[in-house]
Amino acid sequence: DNIKPMKEFESPEKLYDELIASVRKYHPSTDISLIEKAYHVARDAHEGQARKSGEPYIIHPLCVAIILAELELDKETIVAGLLHDVVEDTVMTDEQIAQEFGDEVALLVDGVTKLGQLSYDADKVEVQAENLRKMFLAMAKDIRVILIKLADRLHLSLIHISEPTRRR
């Protein structure tokens, strides 16, 4: 019920404001400085990158973080949602994430990155079994890794569904 349809090219600033409003709604006293720092790091790291639709890449991590915030997850999970593609798609390292945001966030980002290396060849039973094995290992370490990955996939699915509408 909380998941909203894709909006046509929302500005990153408007999405960031929506993220903070969502966090403050369920945790009014939360210190948002770590979330703010993660947004700025992700925005700067993805500077100049765009999705196939032409919108700035930072829109995707922001939408993932909003989904996580609407699920009322903790600040570290939301921060990891903002940073989930930074190590994979930019020059930032796991060590830098740990140094800037702490080991907990770094472990979440690393877990999502490793899950991102899953193969999606639906025809191969062995590949599916390996994917499940990786997911169960990630869940055993921290279920939040799976929640971030699911939010990531959900947003990518929403983009995919809404693209034919945008092309018209």
Report each predicted region and the residues it spans:
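Active-site helical microenvironments for divalent-metal-assisted chemistry
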Residues: 1-162, 166-168
